[in-house]
């Protein structure tokens, strides 16, 4: 019997073995489930082979303890972490906080050693209970937005407490150590007020730099959401509102380049122009752009809403290496395939640890809008980072059980359905045929074939040249 699986095929069905150390960190948002029609996004829409790390946004905090935020989070956790059965190399993290979460609960939690210990203990229990591989701290921001100046040092202490506890728990439990990351701002004011960069970088596994939202409808003139460099005419504070300045700042303050993950947006920031005849960068604007048909948020448009604009004019900001479009009195600064390629080239030159994406649900994830296939922006990152790539659409075959018709021409012989009994989920060689392999998932046995000319290697759990 042929079994069709969403985003069929396992990550290991590759033309080359896994060897790149680059990370591709992708955020999943638990509110995208409420969008209408084709834009609704759930864990089933995720490609388990697309990103190296998936981060679930967001968890909350109750009485200094990690907690859910949506009515169905526990169900979504199960589906989200179940993706690791299809890609055993995938790592999943849970993010706590976010912009709308505010700062008060973080401030209260870090205020005393007892409160921090309560949080740390709850985090370990919560992550293990729901099968996450780590925690992502998204406090926006210590020392700002109502958070007192003392929270700068207290955030450092929190990071140290979590890192120490994660290490101790791994030694006690015998399990792989939980990962610890943080989403951090690009703006110098926020960084100076809230982060002892060299100290937290020692204890974080990686640092997700939110290199976007440099400009938006909160300003009175148009500007790009995520420019790579400054414009020639910019000086002073304005000259620091770009990706390059943010990266240099975090590196100079002590972040190892290999730990710094460059954030990239799959959305644009939109404006309503004061005059439809003045469409330049820096043109006067009266406020946020018109809400998109799916995201329904003024001043922000998903890539799948931007790419399908009819009658719009697209131009590139040569100094900043990014595009914008305009139509009538609407103006949007966004990223496209070309700008993502340029940014990956940049991060490689800087020796950074990889790319981060906000967010999965804002790319054209189903290929319904841009005529560029599924996940055109994130697939571009994957390819440019030289991560092994599995084309979607490869069918997964369930091994026939006794009495079932043997539709897969080269399926295992009847009786091998017991192969996975007592085995951990994962990939195993087919002793009868090197060009195929077995996969065990929740006690079920599946067989897949390598591409023509390749054989399965048990050492890398991948298809490679003979």
Curated annotation (Swiss-Prot):
Note the SUPFAM superfamilies from the entry.
Answer: (Trans)glycosidases (SSF51445), Chitinase insertion domain (SSF54556), Invertebrate chitin-binding proteins (SSF57625)
Q: Where is this region: Disordered?
A: 392-424
Gene Ontology biological process: chitin catabolic process; immune response; polysaccharide catabolic process; polysaccharide digestion; response to bacterium
Which terms does the record give in the GO molecular function aspect? chitin binding; chitinase activity; endochitinase activity; hydrolase activity, hydrolyzing O-glycosyl compounds
> What keywords tag this UniProt record?
Carbohydrate metabolism, Chitin degradation, Chitin-binding, Disulfide bond, Glycoprotein, Glycosidase, Hydrolase, Lysosome, Polysaccharide degradation, Secreted, Signal
Residues the record lists as binding chitin: 70-71, 97-100, 141, 210-213, 358
Reaction it catalyzes: Random endo-hydrolysis of N-acetyl-beta-D-glucosaminide (1->4)-beta-linkages in chitin and chitodextrins
> CDD domains, alphabetically?
GH18_chitolectin_chitotriosidase
Could you tell me where this protein is found in the cell?
Secreted; Lysosome
GO CC terms, sorted: extracellular region; extracellular space; lysosome; specific granule lumen; tertiary granule lumen
Its EC number(s)? 3.2.1.14
Give the residues annotated as active site.
140
- Residues that carry a glycan: 100
Question: Which residue intervals define the domain GH18 in the entry?
Answer: 22-388
Q: Which cysteines are joined by disulfide bonds?
A: 26-51, 307-370, 450-463
Assembly and partners are described as:
Monomer.
Query: Per its database record, what is this protein's job?
Result: Degrades chitin, chitotriose and chitobiose. May participate in the defense against nematodes and other pathogens. Isoform 3 has no enzymatic activity.
Family indicated by similarity: Belongs to the glycosyl hydrolase 18 family. Chitinase class II subfamily.
Q: Please tell me what else the database record remarks about this protein.
A: Very high plasma levels of CHIT1 are found in patients with Gaucher disease type 1 (GD I). Can be used as diagnostic aid and to evaluate the success of treatment that brings levels back to normal.
What name does UniProt use for this protein?
Chitotriosidase-1
Which organism does this sequence originate in? Homo sapiens
């Amino acid at each position: 019997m042929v079994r069709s699986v969403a985003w069929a095929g396992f990550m290991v069905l590759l033309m080359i073995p896994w060897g790149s150390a680059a990370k591709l960190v992708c955020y999943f948002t638990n509110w995208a489930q409420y969008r209408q029609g084709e834009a609704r996004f759930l864990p089933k829409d995720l490609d388990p082979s697309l990103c190296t790390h998936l981060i679930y946004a967001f968890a909350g905090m109750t009485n200094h303890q990690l907690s859910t935020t949506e009515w169905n989070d526990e169900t979504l956790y199960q589906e989200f972490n179940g993706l690791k059965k299809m890609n055993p190399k995938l790592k999943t993290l849970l993010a706590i906080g976010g912009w709308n979460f505010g700062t008060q609960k973080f401030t209260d939690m870090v205020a005393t050693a007892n409160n921090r210990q309560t949080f740390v203990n709850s985090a370990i229990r919560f992550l293990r209970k729901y099968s996450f591989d780590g925690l992502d701290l998204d406090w926006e921001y210590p020392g700002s937005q109502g958070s007192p100046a003392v929270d700068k040092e207290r955030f450092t202490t929190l990071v140290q407490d979590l890192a120490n506890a994660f290490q101790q728990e791994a030694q006690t439990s015998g399990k792989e150590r939980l990962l610890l990351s943080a989403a951090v701002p690009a703006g110098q004011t926020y960084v100076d007020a809230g982060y002892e960069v060299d100290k937290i970088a020692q204890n974080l596994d990686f640092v997700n730099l939110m290199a976007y939202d440099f400009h938006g409808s909160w300003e009175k003139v148009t500007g790009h959401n995520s420019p790579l460099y400054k414009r020639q005419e910019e000086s002073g504070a304005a000259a620091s509102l770009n990706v390059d300045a943010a990266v240099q700042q975090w590196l100079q303050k002590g972040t190892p380049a290999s730990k710094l993950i460059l954030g990239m947006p799959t959305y644009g920031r939109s404006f309503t122009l004061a005059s439809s005849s003045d469409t330049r960068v820096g043109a006067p604007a009266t406020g946020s752009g018109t809400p998109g048909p799916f995201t329904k948020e003024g001043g922000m448009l998903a890539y799948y809403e931007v790419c399908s604009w009819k009658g719009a004019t697209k131009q590139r900001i040569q100094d900043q290496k990014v595009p914008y479009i305009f139509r009538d009195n609407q103006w949007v600064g966004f990223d496209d395939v070309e700008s993502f390629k340029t940014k990956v080239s940049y991060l490689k030159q800087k020796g950074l640890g990889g790319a981060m994406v906000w967010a999965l649900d804002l790319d054209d994830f189903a290929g319904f809008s841009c005529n560029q296939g599924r996940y055109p922006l994130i697939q571009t990152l994957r390819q440019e980072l030289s991560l092994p790539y599995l084309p979607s659409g490869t069918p997964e075959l369930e091994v026939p059980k006794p009495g079932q018709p043997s539709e897969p021409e080269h399926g295992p012989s009847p009786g091998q359905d017991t192969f996975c009994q007592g085995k951990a989920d994962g990939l195993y060689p087919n002793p009868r045929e090197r060009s195929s392999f077995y996969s065990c998932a929740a006690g079920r046995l599946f067989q897949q074939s390598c591409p023509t000319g390749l054989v399965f290697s048990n050492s890398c759990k991948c298809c490679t040249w003979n």
